[in-house]
């Protein structure tokens, strides 16, 4: 149950590595940031518990709760005051809910298992926790988890769930059961489909009035029978015989962390009848019920699945200038792991898009992986009290700027080098942005073709370049000198498609310079506007100077 898990501080801290840095804030700002986040979490909490409405995704709430705890620890605040759910329920649990401690990784699971035996793994079903009380073979009470000690009376609602047995016999005739009410699914694959806000949906169904029909889609997974049969197999057998079949179907004995990992992966990647957010490892033998207390269930632990999306703090905002002068915005992040990818940066988009997002350093954004593992922003989930946003560059850049290196042209100049080295232009194999930056920093290029003037000795003397790397690059530069004329023109940024240039058929710089706008307009995919841009490009002094420089180096098509 989402908010109920907050009763134990340590349960939240799995979201943050132990090395998470404390913010460099003044005491006044720290108090302000903490108070605002506490207030927001309290509002979400109230909406969730009192109205059954989730104003924020479960995972976002959990991660921001963990962030609050970290800030409180950094600045000496009370880490427990605001974390418990509001308790409107007054019905005591016959046996308290202990909660489950979360472990960060396989190594932690292995450590926990080391001195324990008779271990079992179960899915960590994503729903809302409940106590079911049977007396004389009848369901007499159903209690929401609440704060683990007291909760809401859900008896009438639970009696309307067909999947919950209304009567029991044998040892279960007088029993207290703890479990998870969940929304039934047909082959839910957690890795592909994510959590689907399952907890909030179930909570809403249990809170709202006049929704009898929706309760038909709920079921229950029993994960605890306090003071029940002494062995796990016997508990599971009797539960299954009474109509609580999911526990037996989805409980497996394990002897090692490898076993747990195998089952965890299988349940993460195959279809299940419920949403899960990890697995629970527990001992078959449990303490007597009189010893159960919230936060003290040391006989079970959880190993959660990696979230589909994670909340990341924005540590900086940078502006990148592309080869055509287009400005894009990149947000630097406090590193987060998504799948096996360490994400430190995310593309925001254009300046206009950045302004629409209203992202500043200190904000927290929800980040996920799009196609091909590219990080993307899903939403801004929390904004810092201080809005120190950098000013974007002015309108100094366009498609005809930065062919020559100047102090204000560094980013667009590098972007032009990256472009000319790409397969669409000169295809300088083995050279990416990092390599061009190293070369430019070491040899202070005057313009985008200055690298052609480098000697083999200069390449070998470039810091960070091995002898082998320098030799390969020298070979590449010599190959590039013989690229077709059309490739060089593409490298110079002519605003035409390669198809239009091929249709043109010019093989010399002189021919190309002599063409009129009317001529260019007749080529495929070249309208009046593009033809006009070609003439502007042709007449640009820097382009003319580059053409002369290439002619002096006897490059194909440029020599008289």
Curated annotation (Swiss-Prot):
Keywords from the UniProt entry: DNA damage, DNA repair, DNA replication, Ligase, NAD
EC identifiers of the protein: 6.5.1.2
Active site, per annotation: 124
GO biological-process terms attached to the record: DNA repair; DNA replication
Domain of life: Bacteria
Matching Pfam families: DNA_ligase_aden, DNA_ligase_OB
Keyword Ion transport assigned: no
SMART domains: LIGANc
Reactions that this protein is recorded to catalyse: NAD(+) + (deoxyribonucleotide)n-3'-hydroxyl + 5'-phospho-(deoxyribonucleotide)m = (deoxyribonucleotide)n+m + AMP + beta-nicotinamide D-nucleotide
An MF annotation (GO) of this entry: DNA ligase (NAD+) activity
Enzyme type, top EC level: ligase
Function in brief: Catalyzes the formation of phosphodiester linkages between 5'-phosphoryl and 3'-hydroxyl groups in double-stranded DNA using NAD as a coenzyme and as the energy source for the reaction.
Family named by the database record: Belongs to the NAD-dependent DNA ligase family. LigB subfamily.
Protein name in UniProt: DNA ligase B
Organism name: Citrobacter koseri (strain ATCC BAA-895 / CDC 4225-83 / SGSC4696)
């Amino acid at each position: 149950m989402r908010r109920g898990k907050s009763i134990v501080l340590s349960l939240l801290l799995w979201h943050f590595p132990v090395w998470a840095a404390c913010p460099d804030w003044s005491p006044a700002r720290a108090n302000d940031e903490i108070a605002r986040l506490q207030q927001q979490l309290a509002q979400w909490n109230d909406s969730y518990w009192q109205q059954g409405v989730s104003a924020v995704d479960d995972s976002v709430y959990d991660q921001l709760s963990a962030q609050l705890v970290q800030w409180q620890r950094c600045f000496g605040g009370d880490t427990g005051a605001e974390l418990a759910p509001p308790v409107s329920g007054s019905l005591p649990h016959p046996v308290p809910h202990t909660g489950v401690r979360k472990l960060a990784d396989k190594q932690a699971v292995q450590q926990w298992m080391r001195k324990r035996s008779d271990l079992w793994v179960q899915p960590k079903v994503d729903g809302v926790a409940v106590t079911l009380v049977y007396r004389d073979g009848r369901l007499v009470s159903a209690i929401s988890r609440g704060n683990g000690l007291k909760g809401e009376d859900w008896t009438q609602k639970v009696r309307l769930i067909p999947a919950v047995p209304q009567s029991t016999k044998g040892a279960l005739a007088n029993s207290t059961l703890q479990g998870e009410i969940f929304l039934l699914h047909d082959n839910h694959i957690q890795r592909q489909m994510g959590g689907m806000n399952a907890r909030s949906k179930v909570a809403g169904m249990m809170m709202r009035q006049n929704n009898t029909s929706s309760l038909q889609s709920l079921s229950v997974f029993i994960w605890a029978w306090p003071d029940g049969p002494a062995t796990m197999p016997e508990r599971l057998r009797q539960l299954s015989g009474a109509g609580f079949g999911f526990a037996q179907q989805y409980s497996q004995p394990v002897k090692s962390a490898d076993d747990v990992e195998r089952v965890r992966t299988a349940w993460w990647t195959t279809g299940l009848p419920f949403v899960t957010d990890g697995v629970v490892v527990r001992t078959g033998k449990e303490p007597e019920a009189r010893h159960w207390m919230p936060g003290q269930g040391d006989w079970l632990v959880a190993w959660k699945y990696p979230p589909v999306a994670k909340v990341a703090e924005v540590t900086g905002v940078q502006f990148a200038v592309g080869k055509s002068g287009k400005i894009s915005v990149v947000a630097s992040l406090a590193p987060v792991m998504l799948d096996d990818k360490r994400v430190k940066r995310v593309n925001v988009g254009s300046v206009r898009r950045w302004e629409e997002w209203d992202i500043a350093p200190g904000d927290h954004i929800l980040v996920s992986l799009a196609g091909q593992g590219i990080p993307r922003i899903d939403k801004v989930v929390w904004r810092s009290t201080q809005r120190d946003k950098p000013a974007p560059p002015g309108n100094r850049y366009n498609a005809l700027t930065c062919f020559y290196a100047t102090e204000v042209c560094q980013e667009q100049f590098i972007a032009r080098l990256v472009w000319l080295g790409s397969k669409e232009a000169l295809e300088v194999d083995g050279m990416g942005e990092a390599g061009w930056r190293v070369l430019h920093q070491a040899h202070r290029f005057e313009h985008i073709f200055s690298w052609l003037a480098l000697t083999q000795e200069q390449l070998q003397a470039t810091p960070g370049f091995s002898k082998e790397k320098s030799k390969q690059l020298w070979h590449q530069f010599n190959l590039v000198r013989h690229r077709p004329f059309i490739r060089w023109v593409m490298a110079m940024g002519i605003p035409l498609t390669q198809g239009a240039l091929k249709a043109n058929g010019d093989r010399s710089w002189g021919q190309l310079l002599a063409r009129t706008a009317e001529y260019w307009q007749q080529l495929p995919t070249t309208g009046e506007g593009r033809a006009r841009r070609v003439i502007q490009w042709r007449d640009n002094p820097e382009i003319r100077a580059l053409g002369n420089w290439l002619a002096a180096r006897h490059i194909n098509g440029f020599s008289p």
